[in-house]
């Protein structure tokens, strides 16, 4: 499936080494100011080749808006966006044309479709995420109309985990580190993996402030379930946590429950969601990324004829996919919330009366 969302819908298309990547966003209310500079800023944060901690593939990632916007405002019709691929080097993949790269989707795509685009993984490449970030930027514009702010940053690289979360600092950090005190150690881990022709995993934290209570569609489109689906649909994400996450299974109920007083919740172990519905607290979501599977160490594998081969990868690859992946995770959370915001508009009769009985 290449379409995401129920009311705020995004369809993406394109491959890593094709002409480009694009998306169509449907369901956007008319009259939303489309800030192209904000879209550009988010694309720049995800863009490759920014520093030594990301892939050296160079892409301008300039977004061309094809439809759905007139004089800076959404028209209510589908918004089409296109991002050209300008930095492809398909020759880097000639030696693995018939070889399944360990840790990649080569084998599974081949088993499903009987054919695969070996140039950078084709549709399965993380290059596709450029369209998600463009669409996510539009979703964030809608959320900002309601003072909902989505932020992201890196909370851990390898086994080095930050103890404090400073989202303002993450905006300035080369690796989007949330904890200044352990940033240099986290950078060193990435540099060490790169020197060894290896890669390293990491985790991103996404925080949403200003989210009203009531968003989520139980039972089968819960907010936490939708977030899990969105984030687990990203390349390299292997686990998602909300609030205290996995630690919750070690806690007592008296420890985990978020008690309330006249000022609201006194803690936030639930991460802003109860019963699949937002509770008005800050939404806290972690996405855990595996190490980039493209490493320059020879590995054992099979070819399309199921003959044993040695895979020797060439090209330009992220030593830690979590760094740029954090921006994509932020975009996906924004897309989920924009969708939930529109769905919630019909959840009570009084909401409809405000529109139709003025």
Curated annotation (Swiss-Prot):
It holds the Pfam family Chorismate_synt. Its EC number is 4.2.3.5. Reduced FMN (FMNH(2)). InterPro entries: Chorismate_synth, Chorismate_synth_AroC_sf, Chorismate_synthase_CS. It catalyses: 5-O-(1-carboxyvinyl)-3-phosphoshikimate = chorismate + phosphate. SUPFAM superfamilies: Chorismate synthase, AroC. One of its GO terms (biological process) is amino acid biosynthetic process. Its cofactor is FMNH2. One of its GO terms (molecular function) is chorismate synthase activity. NADP(+) binds at residue 46. FMN binds at residues 123-125, 235-236, 275, 290-294, 316. GO terms for cellular component: cytosol. CDD domains: Chorismate_synthase. Keywords: Amino-acid biosynthesis, Aromatic amino acid biosynthesis, FAD, Flavoprotein, FMN, Lyase, NADP. NCBIfam families: aroC (TIGR00033), PRK05382.1 (NF003793). HAMAP family: Chorismate_synth (MF_00300). Belongs to the chorismate synthase family. Homotetramer. This is Chorismate synthase.
């Amino acid at each position: 499936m290449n379409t995401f969302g129920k009311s705020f819908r995004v369809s993406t298309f394109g491959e890593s080494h094709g002409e480009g990547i694009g998306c169509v966003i449907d369901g956007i209310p008319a009259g939303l100011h489309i800030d192209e500079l904000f879209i550009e800023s988010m694309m720049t944060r995800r863009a490759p080749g920014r520093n030594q901690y990301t892939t050296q593939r160079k892409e301008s990632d300039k977004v061309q808006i094809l439809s759905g916007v007139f004089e800076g405002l959404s028209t209510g019709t589908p918004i089409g966006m296109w991002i050209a691929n300008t930095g492809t080097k398909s020759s880097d993949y000639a030696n693995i044309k018939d070889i399944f790269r360990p840790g990649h989707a080569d084998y599974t795509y081949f088993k499903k479709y009987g054919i695969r685009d070996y140039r950078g993984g084709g549709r399965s490449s993380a290059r596709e995420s450029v369209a998600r970030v463009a669409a996510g930027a539009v979703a964030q514009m809608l959320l900002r109309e309601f003072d909902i702010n989505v932020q992201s940053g890196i909370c851990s690289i390898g086994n080095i985990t930050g103890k404090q979360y400073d989202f303002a600092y993450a905006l300035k950090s080369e690796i989007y580190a949330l904890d200044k005190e352990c940033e240099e150690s986290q950078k060193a881990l990435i540099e060490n993996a790169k020197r060894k022709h290896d890669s390293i995993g990491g985790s991103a934290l996404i925080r949403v402030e200003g989210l009203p209570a009531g968003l989520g569609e139980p039972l089968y489109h819960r907010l936490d379930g939708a977030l899990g689906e969105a984030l687990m649909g990203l390349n390299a994400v292997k686990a998602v946590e909300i609030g205290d996450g996995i630690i919750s299974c070690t806690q007592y109920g008296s420890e985990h429950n978020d008690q309330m007083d006249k000022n609201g919740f006194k803690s936030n172990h639930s991460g802003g969601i109860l019963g699949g519905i937002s509770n008005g607290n800050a939404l806290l979501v972690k996405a855990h990324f595996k190490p980039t599977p493209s490493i320059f160490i020879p590995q054992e594998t099979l070819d399309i004829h199921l003959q044993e081969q040695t895979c020797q990868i060439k090209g330009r690859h992220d030593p830690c996919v979590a760094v740029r992946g954090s921006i994509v995770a932020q975009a996906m959370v924004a897309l989920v919330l924009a969708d939930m915001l529109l769905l919630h508009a019909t959840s009570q009769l009084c909401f409809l009366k405000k529109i139709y009985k003025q």
